[in-house]
Amino acid sequence: MAKVPDLFEDLKNCYSENEDYSSEIDHLSLNQKSFYDASYGPLREDHMNKFMSLDTSETSKTSRLSFKENVVMVTANGKILKKRRLSLNQFITDDDLEAIANDTEEEIIKPRSAHYSFQSNVKYNFMRVIHQECILNDALNQSIIRDMSGPYLMAATLNNLEEAVKFDMVAYVSEEDSQLPVTLRISKTQLFVSAQNEDEPVLLKEMPETPKIIKDETNLLFFWEKHGSMDYFKSVAHPKLFIATKQEKLVHMASGPPSITDFQILEK
């Protein structure tokens, strides 16, 4: 089993070359002895050739350095390949860690843009109706119909497509998105498909009129994606979830199989 040799000694040398580091972050502990004397055990096999954080909650009781300030990549033989000192309160993802290893230049990683639910200033403006009275069939050739037990939809195999729900698809546009957001409204009504959480049934939400601007009601919006002959509707409010069907289950939100997220749009 490989052991990590003197990681903290390496960091000590790094800090000693930059003595004014402590003045930049005045809340960090300056007791180097308690920090560098921290004990560490053998490197576990599942940590070899992977990124490790010097999280001092596991190595030192007095230091306040955290995962967000120092990231180190260590090989199986304990060699430090890269060190990165990051700014405080910076959100780090696995993709950011991959960037540390792949970048030839050392630089501070910029935080990613906010999730859609936090972009409260994003406005989606009405563009035009792009489909009228269309039918949605899933990959099993089931059509979307109303479920009369409540404001829900379900999928069923129909002999007569006149029994299927007819949808109007309305396109919207915003400055922030390159994808095409749409709403799905039951034709000749003001009932709009509204996304919910994963595995929860979509709801039919009644609006007083077709919205000209959508800002807070992003549950009504779906990014329409087309791959080959199949169509997909990804929630703007929940970007990992799609409108989906499943046998003996209401139309709901899902990230993929075993639910069916593939649809075909059938024109009137």
From Swiss-Prot:
InterPro entries: IL-1_alpha (IPR003295), IL-1_CS (IPR020877), IL-1_fam (IPR000975), IL-1_propep (IPR003502), IL1/FGF (IPR008996). Keywords: Acetylation, Cytokine, Cytoplasm, Glycoprotein, Inflammatory response, Mitogen, Nucleus, Phosphoprotein, Pyrogen, Secreted. GO terms for biological process: cellular response to heat; cellular response to lipopolysaccharide; cytokine-mediated signaling pathway; fever generation; immune response; positive regulation of cell division; positive regulation of gene expression; positive regulation of immature T cell proliferation in thymus. The modification Phosphoserine is found at S87. The keyword Glycoprotein applies. Glycans are attached at N102, N141. It is found in: Nucleus; Cytoplasm; Secreted. It comes from the Eukaryota. GO terms for cellular component: cytosol; extracellular space; nucleus. Residues 1-112 form a propeptide. Acetylated within its nuclear localization sequence, which impacts subcellular localization. The modification N6-acetyllysine is found at K82. Residues 82-86 are annotated as: Nuclear localization signal (NLS). It holds the Pfam family IL1. GO terms for molecular function: copper ion binding; cytokine activity; interleukin-1 receptor binding. The similarity among the IL-1 precursors suggests that the amino ends of these proteins serve some as yet undefined function. Belongs to the IL-1 family. This is Interleukin-1 alpha. It comes from Capra hircus (Goat). The gene is IL1A.
